[in-house]
A protein has these predicted regions:
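Boundary regions of SH3-family modules and the immediately adjacent low-complexity/disordered segments
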Residues: 15-19, 37, 66-115, 143-167
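Phenylalanine-focused residue identity feature
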Residues: 7-8, 98
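Sec-dependent signal peptide recognition
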Residues: 1-7
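Surface-exposed aromatic
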Residues: 140
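Beta-loop motif signature
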Residues: 24-62, 99-137
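N-terminal signal peptide c-region/cleavage motif recognized by signal peptidases
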Residues: 9-14
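Residue-level detector of functional hotspots within protein domains
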Residues: 5, 16-18, 49-51
């Protein structure tokens, strides 16, 4: 019975709290700040693997993230614990990405609803990764990598694995 309850709790958590991986093409460590556009409190080092963060809230394209960051692709998967802020940890949306789990066709909508008009985009744009912009209920607004298209997708269709695709 405990396993069923735990699974149910995790399923709800996964649908309402999205995750994203860090893709910072600057060639330098990624800054984590104490507020949107605030003081840098930690730098996330470059790695051969990837980092996955939990997105908590957004303010002016800055995402507040959970203080535990999952590290993938190293010899052993590990966790990086952020330190140095009493006001939370913030990272800019432009270095956060995720993919689409399953078939990407008709996933993006003009409005945050299954009844919203499906957006017809080239599949290659959807495979290049999406940047998170805002959350409304169980929907997340995203921007394509080329910054030319935005749309809404269900949070449960997020693939936040930086090393593989999600079924």
């Amino acid at each position: 019975m405990t396993n069923i309850i735990m699974f149910f709790a995790l399923a709800i958590y996964a649908q309402t709290v999205p995750c994203a991986y860090i893709i910072d093409n600057s060639g330098t460590p990624t800054n984590v700040r104490n507020a949107p556009s605030g003081k840098v409190v930690q730098k996330i080092p470059l790695t051969d693997g990837g980092y996955v963060v939990t997105l908590l809230e957004v303010k002016n394209k800055w995402w507040k993230i959970a203080p535990s960051i999952d590290i993938y692709g190293e010899e052993d998967d590990a966790t990086l614990e952020l330190k140095g802020s009493h006001t939370g940890y913030w990272i800019h949306y432009s270095v956060l990405q995720f993919g689409i789990a399953g078939d990407p066709e008709n996933v993006l909508r003009a409005t945050p609803s299954e009844k919203g008009k499906p957006l017809q985009l080239e599949i290659s744009l959807l495979h290049d990764g999406l940047h998170p912009l805002e959350i409304r209920g169980e929907w997340i607004k995203v921007e394509t990598n080329d910054k030319r298209h935005t749309g809404w997708m269900p949070i449960d269709r997020i693939c936040s694995n930086p090393l593989t695709t999600c079924p």
